[in-house]
Amino acid sequence: MLDDLRMREFSKDEARMLNPLQLAIIGDGIFEVFIRTHILTKNTALSANKIHVKAIGYVKAKSQSCIMHEIEEFLTEEEDAVYKRGRNAKSPTVPKNADVRDYRMATGFEALVGYLYLTGNKQRLEFIFNKSIEIIK
């Protein structure tokens, strides 16, 4: 599934040169698609609205912050650096439904997902996605 969406694979150097908010916007989309697909796969009888509502439980800033708390110890040095760049990035938007700390951690999480996706690191993406499902049951 993941290969189908990428136009090309970025080298690690190319991905590191991207703005962390660019990585985060890609990571946000990829994580959302994964979660919605996971929910639909588990119950094909759900309406689109129910899939959406269930997905929110996984993709909201508070949930992504919880995921980061749990997986941070498993990150490589490189992954931790990407996460921290995303977390510390100055965002032009202010969170409406989350506190700033959760929002920043969620941005770091999304930057990490975007980085792993663009560089084609499917093994680490699968690890993070599977852990996310376990954590936010």
Range-by-range predicted roles:
Residues 1-137:
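Double-stranded RNA-binding/processing signature
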